[in-house]
Amino acid sequence: MRTVLPIMLVLLLASCSSVRVNYDYDKTIDFSGYTTYNYYPDMKSGLSQLDERRLLRALDSTLKSRGYRLAEEPELFVNIISDEYRGAPNNNVGVGIGGTGRNVGGGISVGLPLGGSNWKRSIQFDLVDAQRDALIWQATSESGLRDNASPSVREEQLREVVKKVFSKFPPKVK
């Protein structure tokens, strides 16, 4: 029992900070032909300036590690769109009382929501072929958001989003 409690606590904390990602891409594209990228000049990410800089630093680092380089005349344009919204509370506690007599039964149950609704952030990453002006790859992430998080925590959260989103980029050709 002593080892089960710490393991359960770690799993609970890990599940709270998970990043979910959905992908879509053009199966006819050979992604190995792309080597350069840049951001849309008029990109409106929806993030604060500080968070946008954190996200772009993480993205630059990830793309560089995969052999892509930032260029004035890129082959790919990156567009980022973000949205923050309040999610529904998903934790409830049921409290019930009941009694039974010889031939009489009864009960009462009440559901109590725990905590308030939680904030979520969705970030959509679009990769557009610059020459054809065509969307070729898209990923949308969803993760928890804490407004009162420290700058280092915010940076780590955004790094984790980029890591998870680009873990399957470029797509494997079958």
Give the residues covered by each predicted segment.
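Positively charged n-region of N-terminal signal peptides that target proteins for export
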Residues: 1-5
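C-terminal/domain-edge helix-coil "capping" segments
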Residues: 17-28, 115-174
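C-terminal motif of bacterial Sec signal peptides marking the signal peptidase cleavage site
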Residues: 12-15
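Immediate post-signal peptide segment of exported/extracytoplasmic ligand-binding proteins
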Residues: 30-36
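Surface-exposed short loop/turn segments
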Residues: 66, 80-134, 142
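A generic local structural motif
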Residues: 24-26, 63-65, 111
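N-terminal segment of the mature soluble domain
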Residues: 36-87
